């Protein structure tokens, strides 16, 4: 009998010794704090008995403070182990239920720039926290009431550079995932939604979290900003990075930040839509910067647009009034005051040897080639004495308005072309539209992927700054002031297709009171953003966030969660 007992003791020792050795190896693997513990041989962690909702936690999956055992750290974190509606999840796109009456995602007010404070959060993702979140609310009509105010913006990364998003769609992850967190105003009662998604806490969600998948890219993001440039960027000043968002993301026209009427702005590029939007019907001294350069879609940029105008010096050329800048409006290239560099309009005409000479009083610019056929003289090739080019108006089909019209060296719209006499886009115009469009976006899976250039510059500079990059103990944090527009993180309005479900916070205390809105279309930032985030120190020994990442593993709930979508 005693021999059997001895044999059992020896067997137990043989099993326990390797387990202890393995645990000791993990203890030295990475510093966290002196209270870290490890699962027993069965992978079980004893509850700590703590009740604080500020207890420390880790993303190291080998220890009891890691994401698999968050529910044992504190009784405040017990929801992390409920498995009822825990987030993040994998979303199967073909199983998501299409609801056509789901609202469009908006913010109120639109494009609001906020002063935020960003700090090193140790082993968690740095958070951009607004000084006054009451100034911005999420707007999801009929799905939630209007009292969810902006709480913070943070971005999750992974241990792997390619797998950093917390959510996934059809098991596909991206390098990062941005979360825009909105918290319901505690002073207001949560109103039940008209559109009910079901679930345990239907209509009782205290949070709305917008998740955006972030890709990384290299092209179109310019050189790495230096320290002086970062100081300007973080305070909201514009650098020449056109990007749909913020006050100065529509093309940075010279020194004017906002994309208003740019006229003589020096070297500014007129951005994606130029100054005049799609129709470019301004022509009043400020250059006509629509899609098609000076003439817009309709080529009606002059004050005197589409008429059969007499006297080419004072009116627009031809039947459809093509150049806009030829009118009586001061800064037009070909008009009475012809301040552009265009003068000499046309390859074939001598610009009015028989008329008023040189297209207006001051018209002889240096480089103006207003079309292959456009003879803008008063008696040009037209059949009518003072009607300029007769049916050829508009300075020809290929007219390039000199060195970019009134914007000095700026680009007047896509190509600064003068459009057609019938106001329609030429084939080469469409090609240029696509080319410029491709510089700012690319298409993937029926979505448009926005290249968030300005957001990239802000994140690069913020994560590189020592107040954010260097590890800080609790109470020693020094915040960095950053101006940011949360809407920069989102896809363009037209492409805000999303999945929605009722889940939980992805960090302790893992409260199951969150309405998730996960954007289907991705946003691209520069690869330098990912590098800078991974280099943020998350631990006192200088270990960075690249070691364990800041993503919670995909949760497998007891029952699949209902997921809905607002697009097919």
From Swiss-Prot:
Binding site for Zn(2+): 154, 156, 179
Biased composition annotated in UniProt, kind: Gly residues: 280-290, 319-352, 362-380, 390-413
Further comment: Sulfite and sialic acid may provide the necessary negative charge in the N-glycan to promote calcium uptake.
Protein name, per record: N66 matrix protein
Species this protein is from: Pinctada maxima (Silver-lipped pearl oyster)
Function: Acts as a negative regulator for calcification in the shells of mollusks. May function both as a calcium concentrator and as a carbonic anhydrase required for production of carbonate ions, which are assembled to CaCO(3) at mineralization sites. Is important for shell formation in both the calcitic prismatic layer and the aragonitic nacreous layer.
Keywords tagged on the record: Calcium, Disulfide bond, Extracellular matrix, Glycoprotein, Lyase, Metal-binding, Repeat, Secreted, Signal, Zinc
Compositionally biased intervals (Low complexity): 291-318
A Pfam family: Carb_anhydrase
Glycosylation sites per record: 389, 511
Expression (tissue specificity): Expressed in both the dorsal region of the mantle and the mantle edge. Is dispersed in calcium carbonate and also linked by disulfide bonds to the organic core of nacre.
